[in-house]
Amino acid sequence: MQEICNPVFIRFLYLTILYSFITTTVINCLLMGLLHPCFVKGGYPPRFLIPHPNRIDLQQSMECSAYACAFVLRHYGREASGQALYREMPCKRRNGSVYPRGVKKLLARQGLNAVYCTGNLNALKREISSGNPPIVFIRTYPGKNWLHFVPVVGYDEKHLFLAESLADLANCSENGYNRKVSNKDFFKLWNTSMLKMPLYRHTFFRISAV
């Protein structure tokens, strides 16, 4: 008990935790990309669906990053295939998944500017209402560590509408989207914070033409 309460030990423990946090954050910035805070109070309509016609292709394996990018490229009038883009996708991990930094790099090669943001639901909805589909980084399933890139194309007061490339997650077949998620369920998926990436939650790419 005396050892635990020792000021030297407490200081050592504090510095160890602080050093670990700083080291983890630096590594995350290098691998994942630098986060830009994006928090707003409102300034968007109560419901919105991006009217631009697009198709939703289904991925075969771990290519959600490329399929999300392909969807966005088609939104900007450029024919794109998720399979083809995945072959040139940078920042792949050994298991085939892709760091967010890879999405930013690929879109930059295609002439699009992607800003990796962390923010609130208001910021996400405002971006959708601008007419440009953001790509969110979410959990594939609540409580699981598998992560997933997917474009968001609309919302109403209670739901978000996604252009889902994973067939198992598609739950509807509407004009422009194939997945409808309640705000409550979306927040569970959108919280991607883990011990290895504590600051990376509620993230999305804000994408625009250069």
Q: Can you describe what each PLM-predicted range is?
A:
Residues 93-122:
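Mid-chain, structured segments of secreted extracytoplasmic proteins
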Residues 9, 13-16, 20-95, 140, ...:
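Active-site-adjacent structural segments surrounding the nucleophilic cysteine of cysteine proteases
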Residues 93, 129, 133, 155-210:
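Noncatalytic regulatory segments and standalone regulatory/sensor domains
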Residues 113-171:
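Active-site-adjacent substructure of cysteine-protease-like catalytic cores
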Residues 65-73, 82-86, 100, 104, ...:
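Extracytoplasmic/secreted envelope proteins and their assembly/folding machinery
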